[in-house]
Amino acid sequence: MVGNNSCGSRSIQYGKMVDHVLELQGFLASALPFKFGKLTSNELKRTLQRSDQVSRIIQTVNQLAITHRDEITKRFPKIMRRVAGYNLDQLNLEDGFNLAGLLVGSQGTLAVNVEAKVSLVSRPKHAVLGVCHFNSFSDSMHASDPIVSLKPHAVELSDKLLVDLARDDPAYRNKLHFVRGNPEALLIVEFAGESETPLLRKLDDLEILM
């Protein structure tokens, strides 16, 4: 998950793996062990004065981040599920320099990670689902942006091919009671939170939107 910068159906709420990795430990190509985490400005200054290999890597990457800061900010796309390429934009964070963010998603090309310290989130007590039916795939795509404005925890697409395959499979056939007719596409929308009443209102808002 760290190597791929993975994210799942609830990334709309919780983000990607890189948003939760605090520290990484592992080995460089030289077999030298490392531990990368957030460095305060004073810690970074001390690191920049050392001459060991790990410190030299931090020095080089820090200088690249400073030199190309404007270009990185300008060119890196601001999209929710951007998991391709190296996370150079993670080096421009204002709250501290952390090289761990660059390793996330690098698929082992920069180092071998053996341990990760990650942040955790509480699981919501309540969740409700709304299943939106569409007569065309394009209609479902046009509806996704307004649906996201309702701040759901998840929005998942199932097209007609997937629904038909499920109907042909005895293991899933009896679990499709929520599918009405023969839609070309479904958007399955989840709302979650600590109280059920606001979530039911969200479902009402979703129904009005549809």
Give names to the regions the model predicted.
Residues 89, 132-155:
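Signal/transit-peptide handling
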Residues 101, 144, 207:
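Short glycine-/small-residue-rich flexible loop motifs, especially phosphate/cofactor-binding loops
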Residues 36-39, 43-44, 116-123, 141, ...:
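Terminal amphipathic helices with adjacent charged low-complexity linkers/tails
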Residues 1-138:
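FAD-binding subdomain of flavoenzyme oxidoreductases
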